[in-house]
Amino acid sequence: MIFTSGANKLNDNRNVRTKISSNRQSIKTAPTKAAEIPEYLQLYQTPPGDDISLTEFDDIAMERLKLLKSFENLKDSVSLYNDEFKDKFRKLCDGTKLIVFPDQKPPHQEEVYELWRRDNIGHFILRLAFCRTPENQKWLTQIEGDFLRFRLRQEREQVLDSALANVNFTIEKLGYTEKQAMIEDLEAACQFNLFEAPNKTFYKVDFIDAIELIRRGSVHLKKGFAYFPFDDLVTILVTKMKNNMMAAMARSFKHLAILEEEGRLLPRLSLLSNNAYSGKDYNGEQPDGSIIVTRHMIDKLSRRSFAPCMKQMHNHLRVNHHLKYGARRQYGLFLKGIGLSLDEAIAMMRDEFTKKITSDKFDKEYGYNIRYMYGKEGRRVAQTAMSCATIILRNPPSAVDCHGCPFRHSEKQVLKQKLGSDAILKKEQIERIAELAELNQYDKACTRYFEFMHNLEEGGLGQLITHPNQFYEESQKIVAERIAAKQESQEAPAPKIEKMDTE
């Protein structure tokens, strides 16, 4: 076996970096002057070419990520194309340095350019941050595509025509003569009647760039070109942007490891991708007035308020009286996050583990790790519970493990069996959840599970589940509200019935 020396490896990396640097001059970069931008809308085909500070890097990236998450959460509960969505999203966009609606465009070109620049930079930063796993790539591509689709549908035809001037593929608007020559074919293929078609705007593009429309059967094909109406232009542009994104992120991933910015840039990129799914930290600190959780309450809590991942590990612990390291860490930090004290956590694990091993062996082999998670050993830093992103993207389970995310790490049939064991979900609800998991929409699958388990309508929760402890907290809120409502109805005085005069 031949090993490459450290010096040779360093030289290899330098050679690759030199090659990348030499290629940069052939890459077209985004405009750096206000007069150069073709229109404030863009399809993100040219990366930014100016320098920014780390402070601006953080500010722009986090602003865009928060906006995309707000967009996703709202889209999950309100139809994307109705007025309610527009009104609610407009309020969420207040103060955002990005043109989302046409009437937000400033009067001065310099101001437009600054917003355009932040739009461009934010998009490409997130590309870098989310290029390292297929799940992250797919999430960003989908949400950026939906966001662009929403923005394009707000615009007039003239604005979209201006945006077409800045695309890197050929797309042409049909002239009057060409349109009239094939008007009957266009009517038939695009399902317009005789009076509608002459007043419609049509475009043509290489058929390879219209696969989505061809699949739907809504285009006219002729000599390698696809002809389609203006109504489908947005589909073409969004599909092209998403394809470009996926290809670009795959290339970025190959070069990310040899960047000279490891000390400053890569930690920031990791933070962005991790924060895409996680909200607040669950470190076990409970607000005043919270219910004290004890080990004797866990069985009942697991049945009604645990996410499937935690319920799976809890049941495994009760049946097998043991958890492997990955499950002990994932489940242990979750229990810490819901407020289980260190003493209660040790007592709970000892009760189960000592059904197979001695108490001394438990103390020697497992007690230290529990105390470590609570910040009482080692570095003495209290650890926080794992978010869904951490569970999904790190330390995937083997066939004999019980940790991980059931929606991500279970085969479809196995997942359906697990969901069926709850005996609460209906068959069609299980199918719905399994379909979302198969589409890699794990957060939506878990959210639907939550809603069905709590007798809510789809979208009734009003947010996406992105953390097992969030699942627990939201469940406990609903349970508390329903108990309070029941008590209130029982305490209400019975209506007084007047005695009727029968005389």
From Swiss-Prot:
Alphabetized UniProt keyword annotations: 4Fe-4S, DNA replication, DNA-binding, Iron, Iron-sulfur, Metal-binding, Primosome
UniProt keyword Signal, yes or no: no
Segments traversing the membrane: none
Pfam families registered for this protein in UniProt: DNA_primase_lrg
One GO CC term, this protein: alpha DNA polymerase:primase complex
Gene3D superfamilies linked to this entry: 1.20.930.80
GO biological processes: DNA replication initiation; DNA replication, synthesis of primer
Binding site for [4Fe-4S] cluster: C309, C388, C405, C446
Cofactor(s) the record lists: [4Fe-4S] cluster
Molecular function as annotated in GO: 4 iron, 4 sulfur cluster binding; DNA binding; metal ion binding
Cofactor remark from the record: Binds 1 [4Fe-4S] cluster.
Functional description taken from the UniProt entry: DNA primase is the polymerase that synthesizes small RNA primers for the Okazaki fragments made during discontinuous DNA replication.
Quaternary organization: Heterodimer of a small subunit and a large subunit.
Family membership noted in the UniProt record: Belongs to the eukaryotic-type primase large subunit family.
Protein name, per record: DNA primase large subunit
UniProt source species: Caenorhabditis elegans
Gene: pri-2
